[in-house]
UniProtKB/Swiss-Prot annotation:
Belongs to the bacterial ribosomal protein bL17 family. InterPro entries: Ribosomal_bL17, Ribosomal_bL17_CS, Ribosomal_bL17_sf. The gene is rplQ. It comes from Thermosynechococcus vestitus (strain NIES-2133 / IAM M-273 / BP-1). Coiled coil: none annotated. The keyword Zinc does not apply. This is Large ribosomal subunit protein bL17. One of its GO terms (molecular function) is structural constituent of ribosome. The lineage of its organism: Bacteria, Bacillati, Cyanobacteriota, Cyanophyceae, Acaryochloridales. One of its GO terms (cellular component) is cytosolic large ribosomal subunit.
Length: 116
């Protein structure tokens, strides 16, 4: 049963939320570290870990799933080339969330999410 298992809404409709998570995941994998709000960082962590797990698998089906999710084709190829040696011995926990200072304009909690 899915009681108490809500998806983080992030104050957006479903299509905008999915696009936001795809964009944040793409930028996290491209740059290795991004600064965003704490709620967005927690939401993007699951997606980024899922993409790295797909890259560790390395199969054609996993590559096609990653190509369907991430926005940059070249980024997918580099992720699949680097992930097995970088995260080969690690069973999950590929990201780290570090709390940061609050944003000046609206006092939102910020966090830095980075790849380990």
């Amino acid at each position: 049963m899915r009681h108490q298992r809500r998806v983080p809404q992030l104050g957006r409709p479903a299509d905008q939320r999915k696009a936001l998570l795809r964009a944040l995941t793409t930028e996290l994998i491209r740059h290795g570290r991004i600064t965003t709000t704490k709620a967005r960082a927690k939401a993007v962590r699951a997606e980024a870990e899922r993409m790295i797990t797909l890259a560790k698998d390395g199969s054609l089906a996993a590559r096609r799933r990653a190509l369907g999710y991430l926005y940059d084709k070249q980024l997918v190829h580099s992720l699949f080339a680097q992930a097995p040696e970088r995260y080969g011995d690690r069973q999950g926990g590929y990201t780290r969330i570090i709390r940061s200072v609050r944003r000046r304009g609206d006092n939102a909690e910020l966090a830095v999410i980075e790849l380990v």
